[in-house]
């Protein structure tokens, strides 16, 4: 028989910001370039204590060790920071053709640092428990680019395009039960072609198909 008391506090907030710049050609208003930058961050902190009180062991089972009734203190910090860079360009070619191109680069960093301190039984002499603690970084780099072409002739439109994506992941263990020997990196990429065709069959009706 025992009582457990938990007490702690935590904090969390989010910050976001962005800057955009767009330039349009003086000779052709349909020709433009757009530059964008975004940033976001979400830090979190937690600090908790768990204490065990009024422990009764009438059967001498040594329940403190058997059920791990050790006073503990956990200190956790996590944060995700993301930077996004993007460029988009559109230009008409003659009266029937339009070319679109763009790229996006995302840097996403995740950091987690969780420390656990345990006391011997119900004392307040806390010691760092490496086996129940962890600290690691998860780094992501994502690159995407696209190229599209549009043909518009009277009521008919034809739009083929292709999109490329590349992702790189890097995980590093900095402290705790899992050490640097478990670090790993991986990457992969994809090509995604697409095509869309459409025809206007009335003032308010359009027929469209895509792949």
Label every PLM stretch briefly:
Residues 1-211:
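Primarily recognizes Gram-negative and organellar outer-membrane beta-barrels
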